[in-house]
Every structure is written in C-alpha cells, then in structure tokens.
C-alpha cells in the first residue's frame, strides 16, 4: 500500500449545499497523505449541471490516469445512476448511515431536496444565525466594545492566535455572539484588563499559541518585521499568559488544533450551549 503523499482530484457533489460532503470528505482525507485538488458542485439538480460535472470527472481521469474521488449525496435516482457511471471512486456520505437508522427505527426514509435549514421552515433559526454573524463581525478584532451585555463569549489573545476564525465559526455553526479582542505590542508595557471587561469577567476566555507557530504565521503576513520576530512573539505570549493566570481567565493553546476543535473545547470548558445545530 502506498505511503508517500499523492495528489488527487476530489469532487464534492450534492443536489443540496454539498456542505456535508465537504465536511466528511475533509475528515476522511485528513487520515491520508493526500494533497487534494478539490472542486465542489452544489445544487446538481439539472441535466445541464450533471453533464458539466461528468465532463470534469472524465477530463480529470484522462489527464491524470487515475480515478478522482467523489464524495456525494444525491436524492434523484436517475441522476445518481448517471453519476455512478463516470470513471471515479464514489463515496455516498449518507447511504450507510441512513440504511442503518432505517433498520434500527423500522422506518423507511423519505429523502427530500435541500431539506436542511430551509429559510421558510426554520426562519427563526436562519435569522438567529444572521444576527449572530452580524454581531460577531461588528465586534471582530477589537473594532467595537459596545453592547458587551449581548455577547455570549469574549475571546482574548495576541494578534494571530486564532481569534477571528474561531469567532466566525462559533457564530455560523453555533449561533453564538462572539467578541474578540487582540492584545498588541503597545499593550505589553502595562498589561491589564480593559475597564469594559470588568463587568463581563464570566464571559472572558483566552487563546494562546506556541511562539514558534505564531512566528511562522506572522512571517507569512509581515516577513522580517519585529512584529514577526520570535523574540517579540515570546514576549507577547508570556505577558498575556501571565495576565490570564493573574485574572483567573481560562485559556487554551491553539497551536495544533483546528478551528472546529478550538470551538468545541471552548464550549466544553465554558459550558456554553449551542443555539444552532
């Protein structure tokens, strides 16, 4: 069995959003030394869209001489049959699970197109999500410290420690209103909590990161700058972590964690409940 890394075309295909296909595909491919060239085809509901998809799968096979990987979810039987005739390896992301659930609960599935998160059916959920995203964007990177009473959580940390992507993920996936505030170089000489945070201590949560990883991230943004130097990163992290300990603020190290893992660990540590599923 091959162990060295290989490149492979990967298609995520659905007659819905294809988000489930992408999510499962990323998890599965993360177990292998594969460098995926990914293409997503959502809402494949017409012959025209399916024909274009089949052309791209065929082109991939002819160009590389190996079958691409296709993670898919298709409800319409005729379109599913046509898709499976293409030169590819296919992985139905729901079939085995749906069949098992059907057997366990003794009920036949009734699949429908785009069933999940319909705006008409779940309008309250939809608008809650939008409100959470808007609030989080308005409070990103210390832009605003107004309306902190509406925040579910306030993330603190040095610049580039993962606050913004974590905030947006928690807003989009969990419906949480997230504030994030960066401590910058000018804060290090007299590190303290802002007065605005004193009444919201129970919402504070810190993110930290290894100095080597932080240096690497900052070098990609501002190579050769003092901001990106390992010495500066070490100093900022030591100062901020000392603040977290002094003020009894819970924090985690994000160095080897994905955004999904960071967000889930925050929920676990704080006891926050998801508003959306």
From Swiss-Prot:
Q: What is its EC number?
A: 2.7.11.33, 2.7.4.28
**Family annotation (InterPro entries):** Kinase-pyrophosphorylase (IPR005177), PSRP (IPR026530)
Keyword annotations from UniProtKB, A to Z: Kinase, Nucleotide-binding, Serine/threonine-protein kinase, Transferase
GO MF, any single term? ADP binding
Q: Which cysteines are joined by disulfide bonds?
A: none
Does ATP-binding appear among the keywords?
Answer: no
> Per the record, what are the reactions this protein catalyses?
[pyruvate, water dikinase] + ADP = [pyruvate, water dikinase]-phosphate + AMP + H(+); [pyruvate, water dikinase]-phosphate + phosphate + H(+) = [pyruvate, water dikinase] + diphosphate
Return the NCBIfam families for the record.
Answer: PRK05339.1
HAMAP family linked: PSRP
Task: Relate the protein's function as given in its record.
Answer: Bifunctional serine/threonine kinase and phosphorylase involved in the regulation of the phosphoenolpyruvate synthase (PEPS) by catalyzing its phosphorylation/dephosphorylation.
Q: What is this protein called?
A: Putative phosphoenolpyruvate synthase regulatory protein
């Amino acid at each position: 069995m091959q162990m060295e890394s290989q490149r492979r075309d990967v298609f995520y295909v659905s007659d819905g959003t294809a988000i489930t296909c992408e999510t499962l595909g990323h998890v599965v491919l993360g177990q292998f030394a594969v460098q995926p060239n990914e293409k997503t085809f959502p809402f494949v509901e017409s012959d025209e869209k399916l024909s274009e998809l089949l052309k791209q799968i065929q082109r991939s096979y002819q160009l590389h001489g190996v079958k691409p990987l296709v993670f898919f979810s298709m409800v319409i039987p005729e379109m599913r049959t046509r898709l499976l005739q293409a030169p590819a390896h296919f992985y139905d992301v729901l079939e085995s699970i749906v069949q098992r659930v059907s057997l366990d609960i003794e009920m036949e599935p009734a699949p429908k197109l785009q069933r999940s998160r319909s705006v008409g059916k779940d309008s309250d959920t939809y608008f809650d999500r939008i409100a959470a995203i808007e609030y989080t964007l308005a409070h990103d990177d210390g832009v605003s410290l107004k309306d902190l009473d509406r925040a579910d959580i306030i993330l603190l940390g040095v610049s580039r420690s993962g606050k913004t992507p974590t905030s947006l993920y928690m807003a989009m996936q969990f419906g949480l209103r997230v504030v994030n505030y960066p401590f910058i170089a000018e804060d290090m000489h007299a590190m303290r909590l802002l007065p605005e945070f004193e009444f919201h201590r129970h919402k504070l949560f810190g993110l930290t990161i290894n100095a080597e990883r932080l240096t690497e991230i900052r070098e990609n943004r501002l190579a050769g700058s003092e901001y990106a130097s390992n010495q500066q990163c070490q100093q900022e992290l030591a100062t901020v972590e000392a603040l977290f300990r002094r003020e009894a603020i819970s924090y985690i190290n994000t160095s080897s964690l994905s955004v999904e893992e960071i967000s889930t660990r925050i929920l676990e540590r704080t006891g926050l409940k998801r508003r959306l599923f």
